Regions:
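Glycine- and aromatic-enriched membrane alpha-helices
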Residues: 2-445
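Positively charged, small/polar-rich N-terminal and surface patches that mediate targeting and assembly
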Residues: 439-551
Length: 551
């Protein structure tokens, strides 16, 4: 380890704080994604993100770090295996390791911890694209293999002084290629393996909690100060420049995205606000420590318009990217890497190079282009191979019959359990599980001349659960069961989704209500259902065998 008298307390404290900030981004990403998926897939999304903290942290210490930052094996492609399990850390990070200038003055373990957090969050980005389709065991295995086989070598190429792209002249301040481009290439590969959700692109999947998404975006924005601010491994002016550039690019990306939304759809949205900010953050990542503040604003503004336009990319490629990871992170990471070739300013950072707009000619732009192509090609091919192998052995795609309700299928739980009527949440949205309301339970009694009344109800028209329950019981219902149903619309309906693009919807989510009631009470039950948009001609009444219990 580095001798204590050689450690700079300020630099060390800054890097350790930044490591904590980047760690915080992973639960922030989970919350950001969790708010945008369907109600019955929230816990699955949270778990798919959080598990990266467990899996990748261990693979990084055991194998990943030595591949990424061990002494080069002689090819510039990966490090040797001398640091397996961190068994030999007697020296600090080498001078100029990663992007720091001069002698490194932090303990090696601080560098290990900081880089670990990047390795953790990178594959977690993929989960936004595959929402509602991943088998948990297969995903955990994919995480472990991908972090070793894909992420660690790419980190070595760009962030090790002997990496082949670093020697070639390609620059990546904080992960435009190492993080965002490689994760985006993995998205392309994994989507080819796991396929599309049922009904896509004609069935809409609106977010379950926009406030949750905004909270997650705020955590990401906050954590990004550590993500981009700590990469110089020093608490100095370059760190301050990277931090202010990060914030300015996010601000510019937000505003331009909102203008694009307003121009396209006639309105702007709060989800559009944070989407534009995240696009700006992803795009400035490779350039944050190499450009000036005005350039950061321009880069963020370009990100806002380009990434918003890229929302259509998944339709052109026919890939079901659920939460637009390709448009925001993949396009953003590649775009920022290339824009560095235009806006690079060696006056900001002595380790940087001048881009085309600052008198440096086109050499840096060429180096950036080669880096982007190499990283994307490598990450895509290996990611596809890993995903296909996992799918063949243990399965990566969840079975079709559980994709609509991964929370119950994988965890036996639900994110929101507020219901008073069996099968309904507190907001009236249908849930798969059924049960009985103990507060309103009645002793089981035979129901003479029983009738089964069946109807489908728009969840948006349902009252509070207690109101519906009381109304049906008051009308004479002996048993109430509610569960999910999907019906075909008479004509395709168009609805605007949160990120500002239009999508035809042919299938509609409905709540199917089944009520067992004595024959004479059927009209009263139909009247109750009629209050909530169910026409009598849309209800089905049939005789049933003697009913003797309340479900």
């Amino acid at each position: 380890m580095l001798a204590q008298d050689a450690v700079n307390p300020g630099d060390t404290a800054w890097v350790l704080v930044c490591a904590g900030l980047v760690l915080f981004m992973t639960p922030g990403l989970a919350i950001f994604y969790g708010g945008m998926v369907r109600t019955r897939n929230v816990l699955a999304m949270l778990q798919q993100n959080i598990i990266a903290l467990g899996v990748v942290s261990l693979t990084w210490v055991l194998v990943g770090y030595t591949i990424a930052f061990g002494d080069d094996a002689g090819t510039g492609l990966f490090g040797n295996l001398e640091l397996l399990g961190l068994t030999d850390l007697r020296v600090p990070p080498a001078p100029n390791l990663h992007v720091v200038a001069g002698q490194v003055t932090i303990p090696t373990l601080a560098f290990v911890a900081y880089q670990m957090m990047f390795a953790v969050i990178t594959p977690a980005l993929v989960t936004g694209a595959t929402a509602g389709r991943l088998k948990f065991l297969g995903w955990a295995i994919f995480l472990a293999i991908w972090s070793i086989v894909v992420y660690a070598p790419v980190a070595h190429w760009l962030w090790h002084p002997d990496g082949w792209l670093a020697n070639f002249g390609t620059q990546d301040w904080a992960g435009g290629m190492v993080v965002h481009a490689s994760a985006g290439a993995a998205v392309l590969a994994v989507l080819l393996v796991v396929g599309r959700r049922r009904g896509w692109p004609h069935t809409a999947a609106p977010p379950n909690s926009i406030p949750l998404t905004i909270l997650g975006a705020g955590i990401l924005w906050f954590g990004w100060f550590g993500f981009n601010g700590g990469d110089g491994l020093q608490a100095n002016g370059v760190a301050a420049q990277a931090l202010i550039n990060t914030h300015l690019a996010a601000a510019a990306g937000m505003l331009v995205w909102l203008v694009a939304e307003r121009f396209k759809d006639g309105h702007s949205t709060v989800v559009g606000s944070v989407s534009g900010a995240v696009a700006g953050l992803a795009t400035i990542t490779p350039a944050a420590g190499y450009v000036n503040a005005l350039s950061a604003i321009v880069i963020g503004a370009i990100a806002g318009i380009v990434c918003h336009t890229a929302l259509r990319l998944k339709y052109l490629l026919r890939l079901d990217d659920a939460l637009d990871v390709l448009a925001v992170h993949f396009v953003g990471g590649m775009l920022g890497s290339l824009l560095l070739g235009l806006f690079g300013d060696s006056g900001i950072n002595p380790l940087g190079k001048d881009g085309l707009f600052f008198g440096g000619g086109g050499s840096l732009l060429w180096h950036q282009l080669v880096g982007v192509v190499a990283v994307v090609a490598f990450a895509f091919v290996l990611s596809w191979a890993i995903a296909a192998a996992v799918q063949a052995v243990v399965g990566l795609r969840a079975p079709a019959d559980v994709q609509e309700d991964l929370d119950h299928a994988q965890q036996g739980a639900e994110a929101y359990h507020l219901g008073g009527v069996a099968g309904l949440s507190g907001t009236g949205a249908p849930q798969r599980r059924t049960g009985r309301d103990n507060a309103a339970a009645r002793p089981a009694q035979p129901v003479q001349h029983a009738r089964l009344v069946t109807a489908t109800v728009d969840p948006m028209l349902l009252p509070t659960t207690r109101e519906l329950r009381d109304a049906l019981l008051g009308a004479g219902a002996a048993s109430i069961v509610v569960f999910d149903a999907t019906v075909s619309a008479a004509e395709p309906a168009s609805r605007s989704l949160p990120r500002g693009y239009w999508q035809d919807q042919d299938l509609l989510d409905r709540a199917r209500v089944e009520v067992v009631v004595e024959g004479r009470a059927v009209p009263a039950v139909l009247d109750v259902l009629g209050r909530y948009g169910v026409d009598r001609t849309e209800s089905f009444v049939q005789d049933v065998q003697l009913a003797t219990d309340v479900r």
